[in-house]
Amino acid sequence: MKNYKRMTVGEIVADNFNNAGIFDKYGIDFCCHGSALLPEASKTAGADMEKVIEEIEHLAPTTSENIDFKSWPLDLLVDYILKIHHRNIRTQGPEIEELLDKICRVHGEKHPSLYNVQALFHDSLSDLNAHLDKEELVLFPYIYEMVKAKLENTPLPEFHCGSIEAPISVMMAEHDIEGERYRHIEHLTNGYTAPEDACNSYRLVLQQLKAFEEALHQHIHLENNIVFPHSIK
């Protein structure tokens, strides 16, 4: 049996992504603060660590739906992030933003916190697009070169950023900003709960925002806890 008390929360989720649901339940941040050991993360979240461990140990066995990303080749995992997560942000983000703008026009006067959510999400998309560009144009191409050099047993080309740790530290800092931003959105929306007078579109945009945040959590988890550590090794 694993000693979860000596594992980071990022490692625990990397072992089985279904554990993410348990951490979400207790407010434990596994993506932006995945390097924290479980005792520390539990204390920060005000969670009973023993109860958390009990739920992890009683979780249903891994199924085919729980992909073992940490066993994937690094370049394949980067491909997955690009084709699934980056594409989702670029396509779903503007659609959610458009619907959110509509909801603000109709319901903003009665529910003024919507304007704060609108501003936060707008800033998020703007910053995320710049963030994705940096990964796609700078960091990920070099990771592909690293994998290629290792497979072909050839010298690694010089990186114009110096060391790969430099852009990775920038990406992780930007992940922290997004994590805090979506914690604020979740608070403003009462955990993405629609008010009683909400129309169907209002309820829909909250569902979409929640799904967007959950996908972003997995995106950040894959990079912070798997791709980046493996790239630095």
Q: What residues fall within each predicted segment?
A:
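Small-residue-biased structural context
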Residues: 1-233
